[in-house]
Each structure stands twice: as structure tokens, then as C-alpha cells.
């Protein structure tokens, strides 16, 4: 343990990071297909590199026009991110776009369309007809660190990344470029955040910018100060924070020209910043029949309502599925000693209040609609800038009654 206390660090990246470009493209394709055919089965992966975008995967859909328009969808999303000129290292209008998409495997489809419960066990409930699209384990988490019930390090890192993009797009700092990363280190005492120790902000910029006289003071004033001024936290001391702006020096070569990007490579950024466990499955480009995505959203919904109900100060919940089965094969609740009631009772209440079959998750969270592109950057959880159904606190009273 450091003499400065227990230090925990989380990072975020901007929407112009190469991996996040890929997440954004994959989710934009998904949204376009769901808008035209809500029953679309989609698993789209994207790769970007210098001057090229490759979109591959499996899609089964009746949305023929949207499918035919994928190339334009890709270009529009890249341009919206801000890569609109070769001067920035990438141009959505002129980059090469290669599409290589096939149909969903019929072997997978049969397990999703006709679950084991209906196919073998003779279950008549319509929600028993849809099986999990894969085996796997998913985690959800919530903690009372912040009003949005997220761990403070990742919440603060995301706020900094969003602000980096905001000052670039609204012209406050027009010399910034789309690629960027943030990192936040916080000192804890007994799981309570007490001191902001270090903030790292690395941002792509135009070539003619003086790092010491222009970039460093601008980032401190327009990004960090703005975010910290808006941060209301009773226990956190930010008075002596160490700030590192572009600690490698200049950052002109960024985006896909600087690094290749892939869908699904920022799963810790997407979730809880390493504070909670992760089942390993990525989200972007997957329709909600894939429990990697829908069940992780459901677990966040569960965890957030448990904490909001006052049953624990922090909770992590795990669910597990077998491919082709509707009912989960496992549910696990961990409260880390912060519980107000017996964790066994919390687990029982969750089972009574939440239906965690894939079909029920999709129904209860209304997931068969184009809501995914905004989640491709700045996290899937704890968002206050977009209305996401898994962030609702609509089961608090039900949980209290079940306890």
C-alpha cells in the first residue's frame, strides 16, 4: 500500500480513439438495421487502419435498404466523430470501406429461436421460447460513490473524455483532434474516495500548437477545471492533484493512422473501469439476443436498483447462461460487507423482482430499438447525457417489498 493511501485508477478514451471508432461504426450499423427491422440478428465487427475500414460479421435481417447502405452509414459516423480531412490522418469521405458480412449461423439461430425449455422440456410460456445466444457470464455493479451510482474513478475519467470532445466540437479548442485518452487515480480509505491523486489527459492536436504555452494551460482550464468545478463530492479532496497533459510530448499522429482499431477492445472502459469484474464479452455491434450485451445491461439495472433501495452501499451481481437455454444457470450476489440486509435475502429478492430470461430482459428494457450508437463511447453505464433503460430506478419499491 502506498503511503498516500490505497490508489485506484481508471481510464477513458474519446470517441476518436481507433477502438472507439470501431465500436461506433458497429453500433451505428446495428441501430440502422434495428430501426428498419427490430428483429434483426446482428454481430458486426469493425477494423480501422490507415485509410481503411473493414466491417465484417453476421447479419440476418429484412432491412434490405439499411443493409445496402452500410457503406454510407460507416462514412457518416466517421465524419461525425471528426475525421473529415487527411490533415487529421483520416477522412470518412475518402477512406476505403470494405464490407464482408454473412448470415447468422442456423445452428446458433435454432437455440435462440427455440430454447431448450420449449424444444425439449415442452414449456408453453412464450418467454421460454427464446434461448440465450451463447453461454457466458455477465456482471453488473453499482456503488454510492456518485449520484449515478458508479465508481468515482471511471465516472470522472468519462467526464474528462466527454469534455475533451465537447471543447473540440464546439470550437473552444479548435486545434484539438478527435483521438484522446484520460486517466484518473484516486486515493481511498476504507473504500471511501478521499483524494484526487493524479489526472492524465492525452489529446491529439494540430501540429503547430505549443504544448507548454497553449495546450497544457488550455487543457487545465477548459477541461480539467470545468469538470472539477461541476464535481460535487463530499469526501474527495482535489486541491493537490497532480496533472499530466500529453506526458509523451506532441500527439499529432493519432486515430487509425497512429494505431489500428478493433471493435470490443475497450471493455473495461465500457463498464466499471476495472473496479468491478467483467465476464469478457464485448457489447458493440451485437443485437440484444446476445446476452453478452443484454444480460450485462440487466445486471447493471439490478445492481443499481439494489443500491438505490438501500439494501447495500455497493453490490456486484453475476448471471450465467447456457447457449440455447432461457433460464439462467446461475445468479451470484456480492456486497463486500456493505449490505444492510442479509445478502441471501437480496439474492432471493432479485429472483422475485427481475425476470432474467433473455426474452424478458429484451421486453422489460425495450431493447429492440436503435438506442445503441450513443453507448459506443463514454461508457454504457452511469450515463446522465442519454436516456438508457437499464439506468432506470423503477424496481426500488418492488425490492423493498420483497425484502
Swiss-Prot record:
The keyword S-adenosyl-L-methionine does not apply. The keyword Zinc does not apply. ATP binds at residues 17, 179-181, 250-251, 259, 265-266, 282, 286. Disulfide bonds: none annotated. Mg(2+) binds at residue 19. Its main location: cytoplasm. Binds 2 divalent ions per subunit. Pathway: Amino-acid biosynthesis; S-adenosyl-L-methionine biosynthesis; S-adenosyl-L-methionine from L-methionine: step 1/1. It is found in: Cytoplasm. Its EC number is 2.5.1.6. It catalyses: L-methionine + ATP + H2O = S-adenosyl-L-methionine + phosphate + diphosphate. Pfam families: S-AdoMet_synt_C, S-AdoMet_synt_M, S-AdoMet_synt_N. It is an enzyme of class 2 (transferase). Keywords: ATP-binding, Cytoplasm, Magnesium, Metal-binding, Nucleotide-binding, One-carbon metabolism, Potassium, Transferase. One of its GO terms (molecular function) is methionine adenosyltransferase activity. Residues 104-114 are annotated as: Flexible loop. K(+) binds at residue 45. One of its GO terms (cellular component) is cytoplasm. HAMAP family: S_AdoMet_synth1. Belongs to the AdoMet synthase family. PANTHER family: S-ADENOSYLMETHIONINE SYNTHETASE. Homotetramer; dimer of dimers. This is S-adenosylmethionine synthase.
